[in-house]
């Protein structure tokens, strides 16, 4: 699986989550996830990751995002560049995937676990791309109805996030 979701446990990542969720006008419940991508997970020929689908409206909050990563929403046929601390709303039922330029990713990574990165650090210490996926609780009308998916994705190619 090329996209790995886990709960936020790292104290520094929790702190980052708290900081930028408090700076935007959206409510989040405890279903906060981290998406980790490592270079070995990237399909360099295809430039895409596994498709994932959200069961609820979500707000995506990128933290340490290198240049060239985009979120593609298949139903809307749009690609949205991920920029640090710029939230993106994704409606429930949308099929999404992350895509990136065909450039070695680690050369452009900002390591969030170190305030002064050491150039001699092993590349294996890179923690991955940190993206927060928060489930939005507010009943805001701007989200509208959940998408009725017209795209059929085989189950083995799709990761459903509840």
Curated annotation (Swiss-Prot):
Its main location: cytoplasm. The keyword Cytoplasm applies. Keywords: Cytoplasm, Nucleus. It is found in: Cytoplasm; Nucleus. One of its GO terms (cellular component) is cytosol. The keyword Cytoplasm applies. This is Uncharacterized protein C15A10.07. It comes from Schizosaccharomyces pombe (strain 972 / ATCC 24843). The lineage of its organism: Eukaryota, Fungi, Dikarya, Ascomycota, Taphrinomycotina.
């Amino acid at each position: 699986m090329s996209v790995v979701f886990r709960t936020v446990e790292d104290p520094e990542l929790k702190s980052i989550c708290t900081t930028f969720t408090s700076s935007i006008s959206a409510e989040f419940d405890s279903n906060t996830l981290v998406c980790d991508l490592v270079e070995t997970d990237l399909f360099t020929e295809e430039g895409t990751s596994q498709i994932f689908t959200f069961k609820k409206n979500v707000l995506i909050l990128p933290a340490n995002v290198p240049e060239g990563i985009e979120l593609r929403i298949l139903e809307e046929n749009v690609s949205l560049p991920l920029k640090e601390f710029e939230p993106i709303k994704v409606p429930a039922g949308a099929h999404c995937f992350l895509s990136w330029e065909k450039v070695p990713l680690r050369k452009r990574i900002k390591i969030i676990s170190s305030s002064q990165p050491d150039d001699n650090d092993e590349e294996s210490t890179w923690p991955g791309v940190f993206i927060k996926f928060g489930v939005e609780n507010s009943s805001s009308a701007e989200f509208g109805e959940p998408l009725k998916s017209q795209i059929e994705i085989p189950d083995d190619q799709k990761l459903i996030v509840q």
